[in-house]
Amino acid sequence: MIGRLRGIILEKQPPQVLLETHGVGYEVFMPMTCFYALPETGQEAVIFTHFVVREDAQLLFGFIHKQERVLFRELIKVNGVGPKLALAILSGMSAQQFISAVERQEINALVKLPGVGKKTAERLVVEMKDRFKGLSGDLFVPQGAGEIPAAIDAPAMPADPEGEAVAALVALGYKPQEASRMVSKVASAGSDCEMLIRDALRAAL
């Protein structure tokens, strides 16, 4: 099992990053709350990973902190929650925000996440609220970690930041029309792809 990677970032296309380690490029899916914390292309990064093997694919999911991986692994234990939905959940909320929402049984906040309906939100609360008591130490994330930052430094603007932002939101589980509406709502001159995704996810909560 691949549990940790250290390498050079070759490409960043949210929610996926291509990391080169010893001449091998690994495609890693990351929650947007982790993606924002990555260094720029060409720089070194360390990512904690969870390896998923399916009949039709082998997928790597990556996290900046071990605690975020612990929460991801707890999420995919919930009935009806697979890796892609867990990725979307942790893209819409930081680990601490999600834990707080579950502990406070904030169903209305949870249903705003992509792919989460009322039944799934209720199931998340019922199945996960008691797990946090035994995992409080493992799930503790240092203050500021995993939170959506106020600003993102990006040296280069993609040719179509709005299009890339919409594609990233669709990959996270939003319907194309909804993703387009979310991006249009927060679009402004000078915004890059990551800024648009960040602001769209913020506005959705």
Swiss-Prot record:
The record's subcellular locations are:
Cytoplasm
Q: What is its main location?
A: cytoplasm
Q: Extract one GO cellular component term from the record.
A: cytoplasm
Which purpose does this protein serve, as stated in its record?
Answer: The RuvA-RuvB-RuvC complex processes Holliday junction (HJ) DNA during genetic recombination and DNA repair, while the RuvA-RuvB complex plays an important role in the rescue of blocked DNA replication forks via replication fork reversal (RFR). RuvA specifically binds to HJ cruciform DNA, conferring on it an open structure. The RuvB hexamer acts as an ATP-dependent pump, pulling dsDNA into and through the RuvAB complex. HJ branch migration allows RuvC to scan DNA until it finds its consensus sequence, where it cleaves and resolves the cruciform DNA.
Subunit arrangement?
Homotetramer. Forms an RuvA(8)-RuvB(12)-Holliday junction (HJ) complex. HJ DNA is sandwiched between 2 RuvA tetramers; dsDNA enters through RuvA and exits via RuvB. An RuvB hexamer assembles on each DNA strand where it exits the tetramer. Each RuvB hexamer is contacted by two RuvA subunits (via domain III) on 2 adjacent RuvB subunits; this complex drives branch migration. In the full resolvosome a probable DNA-RuvA(4)-RuvB(12)-RuvC(2) complex forms which resolves the HJ.
Domain III: region residues: 157-205
Q: What is this protein called?
A: Holliday junction branch migration complex subunit RuvA
User: One biological process GO term for this chain?
Assistant: DNA repair
Q: What's in the domain note?
A: Has three domains with a flexible linker between the domains II and III and assumes an 'L' shape. Domain III is highly mobile and contacts RuvB.
> Which positions, given as ranges, span the membrane?
none
Q: Is DNA repair one of the keywords UniProt gives this record? A: yes
The lineage, from the top, is:
Bacteria, Pseudomonadati, Pseudomonadota, Gammaproteobacteria, Enterobacterales
Ranges for the region named Flexible linker are 144-156
